[in-house]
UniProtKB/Swiss-Prot annotation:
Localization terms from the record: Plastid, Chloroplast
GO molecular function per UniProt: rRNA binding; structural constituent of ribosome
Function statement: Binds to 23S rRNA.
The gene coding this protein: rpl23
The keyword tRNA processing belongs to this UniProt entry's keyword annotation: no
Protein name per UniProt: Large ribosomal subunit protein uL23c
Family stated for the protein in its record: Belongs to the universal ribosomal protein uL23 family.
Cellular component terms (Gene Ontology): chloroplast; ribonucleoprotein complex; ribosome
GO biological-process terms attached to the record: translation
Assembly behavior: Part of the 50S ribosomal subunit.
Keywords: Chloroplast, Plastid, Ribonucleoprotein, Ribosomal protein, RNA-binding, rRNA-binding
Pfam family, one: Ribosomal_L23
PROSITE patterns: RIBOSOMAL_L23
Record keyword Ribosomal protein present: yes
């Protein structure tokens, strides 16, 4: 069993993720070994919200070069979390 805090790494802020905020869907980068049930429990525990559904995808490995050396960026799992209508997550602090 993994610690719930370690499963959700950080929210992804992209153009598509910003559009999904209007539909009450939030995008997070998660641990590769996390299951949908683990992610649901972690989001509900960390943010005190009710999760309706979770869509995940394991993004492919990307090869990178630096001169003659070839390396790779690590794979990661992206999770799109849909919340109930009356629940929100405050990702951006308002000062």
């Amino acid at each position: 069993m993994h610690a719930l805090i370690d499963l959700v790494k950080y929210p992804l802020i992209t153009d598509k993720a910003t559009r999904l905020l209007e539909l009450n869907q939030y995008t997070f980068l998660t641990s590769r070994v996390a299951t949908k049930t683990d992610i649901k429990n972690a989001i509900e525990f960390l943010f005190n919200v009710k999760v309706i559904s979770i869509n995940t995808c394991l993004l492919p490995l990307k090869r990178k070069r630096l001169g003659k050396f070839v390396g790779s960026k690590p794979r990661y799992k992206k999770a799109v979390v849909t919340l109930e209508k009356n629940n929100t997550i405050n990702l951006f602090s308002e000062n």
